[in-house]
Amino acid sequence: MLEGSRLLDANPHHISWLKVVEILKDYEFLVLFTSTIAWSGDQRWAEKIRDTYPKLKICFVGPPVTTDPDQALNECHAIDFICRREFDYSVVDFANGKPLDQILGISYRKNGQVVHNPDRPQIEDLDALPWVTDIYKRDLDVTKYNVPFLLHPFVSLYSTRGCPAQCTFCLWPQTLSGHAWRKRSTDDVAAEMSHVKEKWPAVKEFFFDDDTFNIQKARTIELCAKLKPLKLTWSSTSRVTTDYDTLKAMRDAGCRLLIVGFESGDPQILKNIKKGATVERARDFARDCHKLGLTIHGDFILGLPGETKDSIRNTINFAKQLDVETIQVSVAHAFPGTELFEYARVNGFITNGNKMTDDLGHQIAHIEYPGLPADYVMEMVHRFYDEYFFRPKAAWRVVSKAIANGDLKRLYQESRSFLKVRSQRSKMVREARTQKTAEAASA
């Protein structure tokens, strides 16, 4: 981390726009990480900042500017340059005074024209990067972050970058981290964890937010052997292809929970999205985790290529058979830069002008297949949650664990949030039905 720099995450820390402007007066260079969904709003922020500080240098990083840097630079004139894909060393080069035309992996304007410098090679030596936990400790209040299925407070970090899986819908490997799987040494990861345990004793859980944490068995078991003596509680991502021995090593080393992308309970859809996994393997994986006492948070997606009303029902039934502790159900989003986006674009399946959220930030379906209306997919997301969590077994599991852990206050807060979102989702479904009925009547 550059001396004098600062990591600012305004929203969770309730830092107002006026306060952000005040903070920026002490800086010469601003790097903004943007997402596909936040891109329009972030452009407006950048324009306001440019109006306030005309001499401030502004750089954007993230998927939307990586996938179409020409459009980004032409849309937002507040931007001085863009870093494509990994940006760690590009921003350091600029901060250290290197001219734009000598920095790899960036795009910028020169004489009114967009210029794309040669790509920067992917970072191979991840151990050379600074420990993010030191930066978080210095600049962030981790109590401001809450993920319902993780212990509170938690800290997230990475032990690898990239993902060799070819899932057609997944944004990060296709736009930012790449498919080449690169790893930190197990010694470096264990040293950081030991350091944080000593310096940050209030943290209750560490989350490895790797694209695919345990894809290599030997490396995972080696890392677990070094984490086990630290007696930490941690969680990670996982694919269903992970075998029992690896899961056991993780459990013995302090792993508590796995975030798992099951995506669908329909075999053909798993093939369509190049998931590299089967329904049968997913069942075996869930059984192994249950046997070992590992908690699973399962991710599911409705509206993937090949989806039908029957396949949606198959996925809901499949999820209930797996009976994992918590789930997240998303509608399929075709992010620019992904194979799914090209598939949906070429076939004319994208609706709503590719708008993925409403004005309040709630997900909306923007892919519509013949015979599967987008409003039906949204309705089934709503029904999926209800059928899953309002089962007596599922509800009691969540409540009993909160009682055992002394987390009733948190359960109350999260239940209120869940019911609020459920109410908003229900309203969206009703409004879509009403609009459809009105359109049918007018026709």
Spans of features found by a protein language model:
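Radical SAM [4Fe-4S] cluster-binding motif and immediate context
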Residues: 132-297, 317
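Residue-level recognition of beta-strand->loop/alpha-helix junctions
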Residues: 6-14, 174, 212, 238, ...
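Residue-level signal for the nucleotide or nucleotide-sugar donor/cofactor binding architecture
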Residues: 15, 124, 184, 215-218, ...
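Radical SAM enzyme core and accessory elements
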Residues: 25-29, 339-342, 349-443
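N-terminal [4Fe-4S]-dependent radical SAM core
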Residues: 100-103, 109-159, 442
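Glycine-rich beta-alpha loop elements in corrinoid/cobalamin-binding modules
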Residues: 2-125, 331-333, 337
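Alpha-helical structural signal in soluble globular domains
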Residues: 1, 48-52, 75-78, 97, ...
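Conserved C-terminal portion of the radical SAM core fold
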Residues: 29-31, 197-209, 231-240, 244, ...
